[in-house]
């Protein structure tokens, strides 16, 4: 029998427990979403018909994961006693709005799981989710979580996400990428097929 000391705050132990708690939460539509309070982590899932997402469509594999903490939380300015308000709810609402603005996505094709967590532990949980699932909107198609850069900053290149999923009004003001949406979608298919080959355990259906 192993006599290795159990440390409940060890990275793998804690982060794994949070991820399991998140995945045990009910999956709910991204839109509409009832208001709730708190900071935490979330996972967004896709069940639509776009062919380049078919490997994960309708499966319990997130297309995107993220976190929401109060302003100043990343610098340690908000701790155990701070009331974060509705930051996690607002983040999910922002994502639903972004999806609703683009041409080739429908809000009804997205659902989410979210878990309210004490802000100090949120980043650890998000990091573990990213490592475990390698969501395509986090690892390849960057830009989903971007916001309007504001006047005077529109000379920057448009994101991969906004090139593949055109429609956010402010993104139209940015400089076009050289890579086409078709080229990006091909890379998405390659990425997801490789993920399925290399990480078959996350594609197994739950009992």
Give the label of every model feature segment.
Residues 1-63, 67-207:
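Boundary/linker segments flanking structured domains
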């Amino acid at each position: 029998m192993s006599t290795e000391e159990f440390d409940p705050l060890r990275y793998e132990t804690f982060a794994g427990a949070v991820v399991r708690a998140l995945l045990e939460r009910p999956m709910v539509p991204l839109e509409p979403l009832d208001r709730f309070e708190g900071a935490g982590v979330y996972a967004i899932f896709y069940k639509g018909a776009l062919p380049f997402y078919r490997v994960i469509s309708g499966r319990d594999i997130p297309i995107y994961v993220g976190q929401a903490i109060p302003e100043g939380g990343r610098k340690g300015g908000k701790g155990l006693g701070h009331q974060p308000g509705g930051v996690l709810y607002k983040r999910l609402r922002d994502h639903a709005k972004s999806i609703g603005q683009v041409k080739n996505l429908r809000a009804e094709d997205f659902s989410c799981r979210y878990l309210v967590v004490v802000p100090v532990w949120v980043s650890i949980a998000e990091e573990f989710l990213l490592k475990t699932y390698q969501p395509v909107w986090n690892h390849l198609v960057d830009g989903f979580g971007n916001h309007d850069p504001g006047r005077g900053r529109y000379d920057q290149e448009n994101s991969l996400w906004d090139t593949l999923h055109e429609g956010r009004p402010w993104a139209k003001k940015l400089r076009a990428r050289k890579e086409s949406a078709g080229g990006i979608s091909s890379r998405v298919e390659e990425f997801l097929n490789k993920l399925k080959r290399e990480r078959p355990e996350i594609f197994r259906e739950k009992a």
